[in-house]
């Protein structure tokens, strides 16, 4: 207690000594309460501003450090990406894709944008755009180019004839060499006996088919045959 009193008395003597007192400037009096409030307010505002600047600077440094540690593709949040970034990525993806897939995606997008009743089929699109036909032919095998288009453009009757001829050739290839139809009489193995046997087999097969048919249909077929023979 005595030590505290001694310290207080020493401080008072130092402050009250005439040599150490500061003389006030001329023209300055005691500050009013308004001036004191304004000074305190300015000091508080400055302290708040400096604190916010320090916090922003610290957050910026932290984000830069975090971006450096992350993968280049994950540095930006997906929801904050701009439209330009999406366009650049789409262009880069299209460059990496095969040209045929690019065109297929464009065609599918075009068909989806159209009204269901106005959607064009692939055949009409290819017939209207010759460039699409040439590009499709380039992508296909040389032996298979334009087969689908030619098949669709042909008359249904001719199409059936071609299909029947193809089925007949496939059937002849699958049959035993001794059972194939003799197209040329000079070929070895196609003698008169084999020809007669084939004719008998055909007659027996036709009779068996007639027996399996309905009697009314059988008579109708016979009438048609007689009419054709009379003509």
From Swiss-Prot:
Chain segments carrying region Disordered: 50-139, 206-231
Q: What does this protein do?
A: Functions as a regulator of the biosynthesis of TSH in the anterior pituitary gland and as a neurotransmitter/ neuromodulator in the central and peripheral nervous systems.
Q: Which gene encodes it?
A: trh
The places in or outside the cell where this protein is found are: Secreted
Query: Which InterPro entries does the UniProt record give?
Result: TRH (IPR008857)
Cellular component aspect of the GO annotation: extracellular region; secretory granule
Q: What is the lineage of its organism?
A: Eukaryota, Metazoa, Chordata, Craniata, Vertebrata
Superkingdom as given in the UniProt entry? Eukaryota
- Tell me where in this chain the PTM Pyrrolidone carboxylic acid is found: 70, 76, 97, 114, 140, 154, 175, 213
- What is the protein name given in its UniProt record? Pro-thyrotropin-releasing hormone
Q: Which organism is this entry from?
A: Carassius auratus (Goldfish)
So what family is this one in? Belongs to the TRH family.
């Amino acid at each position: 207690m005595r030590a505290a009193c001694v310290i207080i008395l020493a401080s008072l003597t130092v402050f009250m000594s005439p040599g150490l007192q500061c003389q006030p400037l001329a023209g300055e009096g005691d500050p009013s309460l308004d001036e004191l409030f304004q000074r305190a307010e300015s000091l508080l505002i400055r302290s708040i501003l400096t604190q916010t600047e320090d916090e922003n600077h610290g957050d910026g440094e932290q984000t830069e450090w975090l971006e450096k540690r992350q993968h280049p593709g994950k540095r930006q949040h997906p929801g904050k990406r701009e439209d330009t970034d999406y366009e650049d990525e789409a262009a880069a993806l299209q460059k990496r894709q095969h040209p045929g897939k690019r065109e297929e995606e464009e065609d599918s997008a075009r068909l989806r944008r159209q009204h269901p009743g106005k959607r064009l089929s692939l055949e009409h699109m290819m017939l209207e755009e010759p460039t699409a036909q040439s590009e499709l032919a380039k992508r296909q095998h040389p032996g298979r180019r334009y087969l689908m288009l030619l098949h669709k453009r042909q008359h249904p009757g001719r199409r059936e004839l071609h299909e029947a001829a193809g089925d007949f050739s496939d059937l002849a290839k699958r049959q035993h060499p001794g059972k194939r139809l003799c197209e040329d009489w000079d070929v070895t193995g196609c003698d008169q006996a084999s020809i007669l046997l084939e004719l008998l087999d055909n007659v027996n097969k036709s009779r068996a088919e007639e027996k399996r048919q309905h009697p009314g249909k059988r008579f109708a077929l016979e009438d048609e045959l007689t009419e054709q023979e009379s003509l």
